[in-house]
Amino acid sequence: MPVDGKVTFATSFMKEDGAYVDESMITGEPLPSEKQKGAMVMAGTMLSQGRLRFRARQVGEDTALAQIVKMVREAQGSKAPVQRTVDRAALIFVPVVACVAVLTFVAWVMFGGFDCVPQGIISAVAVLVVACPCAMGLATPTALMVGIGKAAEKGILIKDATALEQLRRIDTMVVDKTGTITIPNSNVDFTKTSSMPLEERETIKPNAAKAMTMLTDEGIEVHMMSGDTPEAAAYWAKKAGIAHYMSKALPQDKENLVRTLQEQGHKVAMVGDGINDTQALALADVSIAMAKGTDVAMDVAQITLMTDDLKALPEAVAMSRRTVKMIYQNLFWAFIYNIVCIPLAAGVLHLFGSDFQITPMWASALMAFSSISVVLNSLRLKYAI
C-alpha cells in the first residue's frame, strides 16, 4: 500500500475513498486526480495525498505503462518509407564503391605504370575505407528515435514510423466533436421544454480553439463532425474556431467525408475517440485517437494522444515536419560526404597537379566522423521540438 510520493506498481481498482493521485505521466494533466471507491488507478502514477487500498487488476507487462513503453520501442525500431529507399540505395552503393576501388587501382597502374602499384593499392584501400554507407544508414533511424521519443515525452504516442512521416503531408484534418473537441460537463442543467428529457451539457476543451488556430496557421483545413443538431454543431464549431462542420453525422458520413476529401487530392488525418469513428480512422491517411476513448479506436489509430490538451495536434504535425526535415538533412550531408571524399581518396587531384590525397588513416577518421556527425545532428532534434 503506497504512501505519499510512492509510485503505484499495478493498475488497480480503489476499495475505499480518500486518495489524490498524480497521473501526469500518463495523461499529461498537472493536477492530482481524486480517486473514489471503484475508480481505476493506473500503474506508474504517483500518490500525492491520502492512502490507497485497492484490488490489483493488471501488473507487469499487462499495465498501460508497460504497453506505452513497448509501443514506443516498437515505433523507434520500425522503418519509415524513406528508410526503405535508403536501404535499397545502400545495397547498390556497396558494390558500386567496390567497383570504384578496383577502377582506382587499375587507373593508377595504367597511367602510372607498375611503379604505381603500391600507390594504387593505397588509393583503392582509402576508397573502400572512406566510403561510408553507415552515415546513410544512420540518417533515418537516429532522427526517428529522437523524434518518436520526444513525442512520447509530450504525450503523443506514435505506433510506427510511417505515421510520423505521413503526418507532415497532411493538409486536412477531420475531428470528431464529442470527446475530442468537447467533454461532458459535470454540471447538469434542466431544459425548459416539456418534451425534452434531462440533458447533460458539454464544455469545450481547454486550448481547443487555440489548437484549431495553430492547425489553420500550419495550412491545415479542419472539418468537425458532430451528431448534434445543425444549431448545436454550428455553436460548437464557432466556439472552436472551425469553419467547416457537419451535423447529424453518422459513422458512414464520417467515412464518406474522409473518402471524398481524399478523392479531391487531400491528405487527410482523422481524429476521434469512439467506436463510431473507427471506419473513418481506418480509411484516413493518418489516424489519431484520444487516450480516453474506446480501445477499438486506439487499436485502429496510428497515433494516440495521452493528453486532453489539443495543442498536441499541431505539436505532432510540427514534430513530424521537423523530424523528416532532419532525416533529409542527414541524408544530404551523408551523400555530399561520399561524393567529395571518394574522389579525393582515389587521388583525383593528381590529375590537376596536386599531391593531396586522403590516406587510409585519414579515411578511417573521416568515416568515423561522418557517422558521429549524423548522430549528433539528430540529437539536435531533441532541443528543437
Language model: regions and residue ranges:
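Juxtamembrane helix-loop transition segments at the membrane interface in multi-pass membrane proteins
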Residues: 142-161, 379-385
